[in-house]
Regions:
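Surface-exposed short loop/turn segments
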Residues: 24-39, 118-174
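Bacterial N-terminal signal peptides
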Residues: 10-21
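Surface-exposed patches in mature extracellular/periplasmic domains of secreted proteins
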Residues: 113-119, 151, 220-224
Length: 228
């Protein structure tokens, strides 16, 4: 009888521990975020000719125009108990992650591209001088929100991004073109992980960058300036 009572007590303690663990939430989530252009399909009208290859495209770190207190925050996890936990990127800033993605895409397209330079506030009078470069690309993050609502039996992941890209003539200090794109992803999955959130962010970022460069007017402006 005492043995049964002992087993029952151990069972109750175990269930209590598991219950506490399931209710516990981390103070913050961090995800890897970036764009790998390896498998990107570059439109033929964007690819450089021999004249374009004689110059370098400068890429500036993006600005962040979101109305938020902390520009490192890129989303939230809504736990089962309703608590909202912040999501931050690992080892990078959102503004740098976007600029690096743009750089990777241009390299995939075949252009000579500089490393990501200092942040540009997108005004012609403050345009940084780019060495050996006729054009520079910068831009703004207008929306970037990764959300995961944890529930049973599935977790709902959604990602929203809105980016604006600026193409500038660094010789004449003139903005030549700007374009805005939006990208969204959604996923229902039985499991929850930071890796899965990061993967959804990667997809949305890649989709936004590819949409930007699919615009023929932007491609035409790049070719025009580099062809001078």
């Amino acid at each position: 009888m005492k043995k049964n009572q002992l087993y029952y007590l151990m069972f109750v303690i175990l269930m209590a521990v598991l219950g506490i663990a399931s209710c516990a939430t981390t103070g913050i989530y961090s995800v890897n975020m970036g764009y790998d252009a390896e498998h990107a399909v570059v439109p033929s009208y964007l690819k450089p000719d021999q004249k374009a290859l004689q110059s370098i495209i400068g890429v500036a770190e993006f600005t962040d125009t979101r109305k938020i207190d902390d520009p490192l925050v890129i989303g939230r996890v809504i736990e089962k108990n309703g608590m909202k936990v912040l999501v931050l990127p690992k080892n990078t800033r959102p503004t740098n992650a976007v600029a690096q993605g743009v750089r990777q895409y241009l390299r995939k397209a075949g252009y000579n591209v500089s490393g990501v330079g200092e942040r540009w506030d997108l005004r012609e009078e403050t345009m940084p001088q780019a060495v050996n470069s006729k054009i520079m690309i910068g831009g703004a993050i207008e929306e970037m929100e990764i959300t995961c609502r944890r529930d049973f039996p599935t977790n709902a992941y959604t990602t929203k991004m809105r980016l604006t890209i600026y193409l500038a003539d660094t010789v004449n200090k003139k903005i030549l073109h700007r374009a805005t794109v939006e990208s969204t992803t959604s996923l229902e999955h039985v499991s929850f992980s930071e890796d899965r959130m990061g993967y959804q962010a990667d997809i949305a970022l890649g989709d936004a960058i590819e949409k930007l460069f699919e615009k023929r007017e932007l491609a035409q402006k790049i070719r025009e300036v580099l062809g001078r």
